[in-house]
Amino acid sequence: MIKFLVKGQNIETLEHEIIAADQIAFVKIHFVFDNNWKPLHKVVQFTQDEITYNRVLGTENTSCFLPAELTAGTVKMSLFGYDAEATETVRATTVVKTLHIRPSGFEGENNNVPPTPDLYQQLLEKISEKGKDGKSAYEIAV
């Protein structure tokens, strides 16, 4: 398991293992948040070669899978969070944590990787899940 503590604007490693390339929905990253982060809507960002992949955690989730598009090399990971209930804009950010992905031994015919949904798609999915309990969009918003 890979586990990080998000404390203030810093990401500290709690548990780490070697990450190999070519994984799909296999490497799970778990976060422990300090009290300042707990009420925030959280998003993890993974950046490699100037391409950023977002994983929405929301307010309840504390883990996500590493995006399958990441290849061997270095990856910059950071988080941001915002308080949708606040009267003034609140956005928390972290410094970048560098992850290292090693080449795998995978040699397969089908190297197609399903794309990670972009941030907008993930947020729409969260909104549609909220409406399943019979509440209207207005009731969800207030």
Feature names for model-found ranges:
Residues 1-108:
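N-terminal assembly/attachment segments of tailed bacteriophage virion structural proteins
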Residues 102-142:
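Collagen/collagen-like triple-helix sequence repeat recognition
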